[in-house]
């Protein structure tokens, strides 16, 4: 398989593997292709810079980062450890098994990078329908509050 050289991997956040990953990047001479952003408050703005979001988690409770990516219109390649509830059914998500090997992941990333843009209106409507909008969240809190008042 021919591997493209015009890529850049952006890692947002910090964790226990950061130093190990940085050492591996240096050992593989990939410093020009990998950017460590650390913890950021402006993730939503960073997402607009990227072509694809890749999540290789073995297990996620919901996959909030995948929801954030889709809200920004960013195509996603997700491991099967990310629950299907994280897919907003916008045609932006593709699931790959972590054990599938290198080639299926590369192919999926390249294909997702070529997806057509989904309009913000469609994205907002889908988030509203699935209950992930501000108004839906506000209504859930109000309903919970009113239930507690009755008790």
Language-model-detected regions and their locations in the chain:
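Short hydrophobic beta-strand element within catalytic cores of glycosyltransferases
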Residues: 75-80, 85
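A charged, aromatic-enriched C-terminal amphipathic alpha-helix characteristic of glycosyltransferases
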Residues: 116-151
């Amino acid at each position: 398989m021919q591997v493209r050289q015009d890529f850049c991997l952006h890692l947002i956040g910090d964790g226990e593997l950061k130093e190990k990953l940085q050492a591996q990047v240096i050992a593989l001479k990939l410093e020009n292709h990998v950017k460590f952003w650390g913890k950021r408050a402006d993730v939503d703005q960073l997402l607009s810079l990227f072509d694809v979001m890749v999540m290789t988690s073995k297990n996620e409770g919901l996959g909030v980062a995948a929801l954030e990516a889709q809200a920004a219109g960013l195509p996603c390649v997700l491991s099967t450890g990310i629950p299907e509830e994280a897919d907003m059914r916008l045609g932006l998500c593709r699931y790959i098994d972590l054990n599938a090997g290198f080639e299926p992941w590369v192919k999926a990333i390249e294909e997702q990078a070529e997806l057509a843009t989904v309009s913000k209106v469609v994205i907002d409507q889908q988030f509203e329908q699935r209950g992930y909008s501000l108004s839906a969240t506000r209504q859930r809190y109000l309903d919970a509050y009113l239930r507690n008042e009755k008790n």
